[in-house]
Amino acid sequence: MITIWVPKRLVEIDLYNVAACSPQQLAQLSEHSYAQRVNYAAEKIRMSGAKIVMLTGPSASGKTTSAHCIARALQQQGTPAQVISLDNFFKGAEFYPRLPDGTLDYENPDTLDLPLIKQCLRELSETGKTTLPVYDFSAEKRSDKAEPIDLQGGVCLVEGIHALNPELTGLVKGDDIYRIYAGLREEYCIDGRRVINTQDIRLCRRTLRDAGTRGRSPAKTLTMWDHVLDGETRYIKGFKTTADFLLDTSFTYELGLISNLLGVVRRQFTLEGHNAELWDETARRFEHVAPLSLDLLPPDSMLREFYGGKV
């Protein structure tokens, strides 16, 4: 059961628009609020005495960058910390399970080398040391390289969509593990009617990130979206209540950054059929949102994962 729970907030878009009249102050307040949450998470980890932090969240929740932010906060508080990505435990595309329609099931935990994950986590728990595999994403297979890890008496943060799945941590005693679920907790309304939900924001984050930094067209991202949501329901959200800490990864001023970029995607990329309908419907939800300049993004903002590239 989550011991640190954050209820969702419903914010009037008119209230956001008033705050957006002072964009620098709104951005600073949003960034400061997130930094406080990260520091609090680091404090709770230290208090728990756990060696291993398992951190998950749905797609585009900011789990990867948040893991690195928490690691920095731990280091600033005097605790050595390293981040391990479960992506490096992928078996390789040839071993991926398939969905009923024949497409690869990227969200399935069987894409990972579960026995090796268990072994590495047990070694980290017992000795503070292990050797990690390195995945070659361009070749879509495990490389010949390996990465030695030494916690030096500190903490490792293991991030990935399956991090809270108990199959991964079955060989580690419970006291050595602290579990974090990262997710957005702020939604937006007009006269009390919800207009923009967290799923809308995550779709925008993922689409803009993939187009700006991963070379993936919005059409491809939008085509995969239903599969992504289905995978979250089947493999991620069921373990949410097992977390010790719910990390809120919302930024109020992000609403204006998205509003600024929605039209760019429509002008620069070709979208057809269902993809065009999905993007246009999402864009309509933001039509009353005052846009904000990307220049407001600090160099070290977590949001640079999503809006730091050129769309």
At which residue positions do the language-model features occur?
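Charged, amphipathic alpha-helical linker segments immediately N-terminal to NTP-binding catalytic cores
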Residues: 1-40
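Conserved NTP phosphate-binding and transfer environment spanning the P-loop NTPase/kinase superfamily
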Residues: 2-3, 23, 28, 169-311
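Glycine-rich phosphate-binding loop used to anchor ATP phosphates in small-molecule kinases
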Residues: 47-49, 118-176, 222-239
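Hydrophobic anchor at the beta1->P-loop junction of P-loop NTPases
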Residues: 53-55
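Conserved lysine of the Walker
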Residues: 63
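Hydrophobic positions on the alpha1 helix immediately C-terminal to the Walker A/P-loop
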Residues: 66-70, 85
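Post-Walker A helix-loop "phosphate-sensing" segment adjacent to the P-loop in P-loop NTPases
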Residues: 72-82
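Conserved nucleotide-sensing/catalytic segment adjacent to the nucleotide-binding pocket
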Residues: 82-84, 91-140
